[in-house]
Amino acid sequence: MKRIAALSVVSLLLATPASLLAKASTLKIVIQGADLTTPIQITDRKVLANFQVLSGKGTYANEPRLEEPSFVIDWPQGPTAEPPKGLPRYQILFYLDRRNERLVYTVAYAFEAVTGEGYVYLPGKNDENYKQNAHTIVRRVDGKWFHSWDKWDSVAQQLIRSREREQSTTASGIEP
């Protein structure tokens, strides 16, 4: 009887979206890497509301068809080839609001300014951030590149360009 009860509880938990279980929202997103001398922090709740870690692929046991972009990925386009090696690459760190601020998910991000294409890499089992990510959510598409969501590209690229301009004027001796 205990075994049946335990299996029922496990089945119920697997069918429940991770976002309902966690009741945690993205508290902060940090963009670092490439030529950024200091990380960019996104803390505006209205902006963060668009980029929830616990949304998209892997957040349901019975995966719905993903017809809309979410998190920072354009899911309907599916996986894509690795972007060109010469593109600037950034680490995007996601912090959740669970009793206290905690880093819970990291992805790689690259953007091709000429084509306007952005790319997101979900670390795979042999990658540095996989264990941390898998502790939060296993999307079952880890280790693959995806096209980034254009809404994410718009926010990220505006912030990156702004920071690069600040760095450029500071490096030339002009205060921003």
Model-found features: residue ranges?
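Function-determining sites in protein domains
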Residues: 21-176
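Bacterial N-terminal signal peptides
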Residues: 8-16
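Bacterial N-terminal signal peptides that target proteins for export
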Residues: 1-8
